[in-house]
């Protein structure tokens, strides 16, 4: 067998995005693919060699900074939301310099914070949520103590797409003089382009850092996560010496770092512009409403009215439904609390995809 044929055979075992209604990633935009090819051999881990790519990343940081209302953005493109969350909390720990550091997170926070506790030696405290699944700010405050280095808010929770009360968390962070990290891995490139955007970003003075992933709603090629700090002082807190490279210090978590994510993210945001991104988000929200209407017709109610293009529907048969759909090569996910089936309506989830899905979903319900 020819090696390319062998590769194709393996690739064909993958499920195409047209059958995937659970992923927060999507088919890359054509301009992202073109940019990826152009920068395929670049390594931002050696900035003295790839000077143009370094300059491009700086431009991308300013572009994202504009979206997030930050005049002095400092950060970089990384592997994804997990790495970005690690770096946000690592910077907070290093800046705060407390002996037995802890952070307070919502119980709805991404599982990457489990890894953060293990890797950074930071104690994780979990605050409960209200009836709308937003973090309870009162509980956050009660859990804080003299060793708290950061509190965390989510702008687009993984399971429900909910936005925590970042404005109130920001005021609390300022009052208690701790850092506020906002995990907007998903919502960071959704909320700014909505009709009535919630102020989740650096316009709140207490926000220190934001996770934002262009390889999600930014339609960049994978990997293209992002961590953005309010200013460079947080990057300085992450630096280690790199004596044998073309730069003396490095603030990133990984050494070797592809420039493809930078190029593809910049290409999409620059070519589409603000209005183009608004159109992408508008279309995803429209299709989310279509999905909700179809599911309601079948007797399924959303856990909460969708805030963005993530929606979960209550059912005690979540696991059975997921497994039967998977046998039909449809991919959805489930959540445990409350029991529900979960959907993410990405750009590839078109009205036609929803129609095809509902047709097969009806067959599952008849079994």
Swiss-Prot record:
Its cofactor is pyridoxal 5'-phosphate. One of its GO terms (molecular function) is pyridoxal phosphate binding. Disulfide bonds: none annotated. Pathway: Cofactor biosynthesis; coenzyme A biosynthesis. InterPro entries: GrpII_AminoAcid_Decarb, MfnA, PyrdxlP-dep_de-COase, PyrdxlP-dep_Trfase, PyrdxlP-dep_Trfase_major, PyrdxlP-dep_Trfase_small, Pyridoxal-P_BS. Its EC number is 4.1.1.11. It catalyses: L-aspartate + H(+) = beta-alanine + CO2. The keyword Oxidoreductase does not apply. Keywords: Decarboxylase, Lyase, Pyridoxal phosphate. It comes from the Archaea. Belongs to the group II decarboxylase family. MfnA subfamily. HAMAP family: MfnA_decarbox. Catalyzes the decarboxylation of L-aspartate to produce beta-alanine. This is Probable L-aspartate decarboxylase. The gene is mfnA.
